[in-house]
Amino acid sequence: MTGKNLIWSLPIDGTHEVAASAASLSFVGGAGDFDEEGQIRNPDDLKCQLTGAVENIEAAFRQENCGLVDVIRIKAFVTLSEQVCEVSVVEMLLAALPNRPAPVISIVPVVMQPFASQKIQLQAIAKRGWRDEVHCVEECELKIASVDAQGSPVVTTALRAGEVIATANRTAAHCVETYDGGLDGAAQSHVIMGSLNASLRAVGASLQDAVKLEGYYQGTTREQWTPLAKARASYFAEPGPPATVIPCHLGEQDQTMTRVGVLAMRERRNSYDKYIPREDAWPERVWDWPAELPYRQAQKLRNMIWLGGQVPAQPFSNTGKRVHPGQLLPQACFTMSYISDLLRPFGRDPSDLKLLVCYYRSLPECAETEALVQLLTDCCGGVLPPLTLIPVEHMQDTDSTIEIWGVAQG
């Protein structure tokens, strides 16, 4: 067999899936420009790595009987620079993707990547055959206030493929043409949430249909987190969706403090759009937030289980205090126990995960990624599902080192 026919691999020991499916959706976790031995083919070359990562998404999805044409969302964790801005990355992705309308593209600027010489990793969600079925899109020119980019590519800001809906994540600078950095974090959050709701309404849904909220913000303390959290939460009635919000480098280019996107599901019954009821699990042991929020920890619908971001918070409480403060591996093990707790009421366990997303604090003097991956492998029964690893400089506070969420087969 020639090297061209060999499936790529992450540069980790042990067995892992490059793609997997839960009900109607298929997932690729963290595709990079890897060869079959886990080596980066184009070290430190963002453009070539992006092309290679897209090719690897297509190769991975082939085992699930789908391809790039079936992708509904690509999420790019990318190291930006003065030479390469967010608009440039979107343009490169649009050029690498074969069909129109394009899938939703969400960008997350990051300082670090999990593996040496890596500049980008791509997470992808696909729904087989959606282009041949009823679908609906919202498109607009991509303009980011204060970002000096030539041209304005047309992007998909919301895509509804049957019951599944993806929205592009966004900042206040995406939503307000005259944005100049003058809004505080809570005000930026209100602008973003209003824009997301408008995008969802354009395809027949609303924020209440969300199955997953994913957000990022600048901050290192609970005092910085709280006003943004309350602003986002004000757009949901209880029960809200599972949520994950991470302190993350956003890039200085657009002077923003937060970025949010959602995934949603809504059914079409006869001629009406209808909310899809969820099954819910929240065992008493599983922590609650130190602010009163409407989000849930685990919801099942259409044979998929969506998890909220799990953290090593004190069990049986809403204190916000952390177990094993500052210790990555003990906190990772403890956090995975919450994922087990949440899947158990549905008759599932971590081996049923089809996507695993892990944000973790990575310190320069501590090369813990390899040990973390081994721990996650053990917790998932010896075979990792498609995995997105995102190292960050800090988590919610100095005691926190990790947040993990995923999607499981229901």
Task: Please describe what each predicted stretch is.
Residues 1-72, 78-354, 360-410:
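N-terminal presequence-like segments and the immediate start of the first folded domain
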